[in-house]
Design a protein with these regions (language model features):
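Short, intrinsically disordered, low-complexity terminal segments
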Residues: 13, 17-19, 91, 112
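Generic cytosolic/nucleocytoplasmic N-terminal low-complexity/intrinsically disordered segments
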Residues: 1-2, 16, 84, 88
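Sec-dependent N-terminal signal peptides
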Residues: 3-14
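Residue-level signal for mature regions of secreted extracellular proteins and peptides
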Residues: 9, 39, 108-109
Length: 135
């Protein structure tokens, strides 16, 4: 009877499922990425100087979502490397194409640049602590 209770106790702990922690990490990181990726995609499409610092800040934020160990960080890095177009909404993809084409078209370049500047302003406001010294 004691052995049965001990077996039941072990089967109910996190050690019984070695993938439980990885599932939690994936869920947290994908949730965060789905929130920030539209902004990152648009900054990239606008060829913004804010793209790389904002991307790096976002990666650092995902490190804060996981336990502080090498295996967790490796999972985070792998997710960021493979996520680029795997979660893109078709409407966002259409917007990216319009921005890229608009920047190449002399008739629309001014309007698209204004929209990109508005995005830059939004990002600087949203991440004010990151960009407060870079006027």
């Amino acid at each position: 009877m004691k052995k049965l209770l001990l077996l039941l106790l072990f089967s109910m702990t996190a050690s019984a499922n070695p993938y439980a922690e990885a599932i939690k990490i994936h869920s947290a990181v994908y949730s965060y990425i789905s929130e920030v990726s539209p902004t990152l995609y648009m900054l990239n499409a606008c060829n913004s100087d804010l793209y790389v610092p904002t991307l790096m800040f976002s990666v650092e934020q995902t490190y804060n979502l996981v336990p502080a160990n090498a295996q967790s960080y490796e999972i985070v890095n792998t997710i960021w490397k493979t996520q680029e177009h795997s979660m893109m909404d078709p409407r966002l993809e259409a917007s990216l194409i319009m921005v890229k084409q608009g920047l190449r078209n002399p008739e629309t370049v001014t309007e698209v640049q204004a929209a990109c500047e508005a995005l830059n302003s939004y990002v600087k406001t949203r991440f004010y602590w990151e960009y407060s010294t870079s006027g």
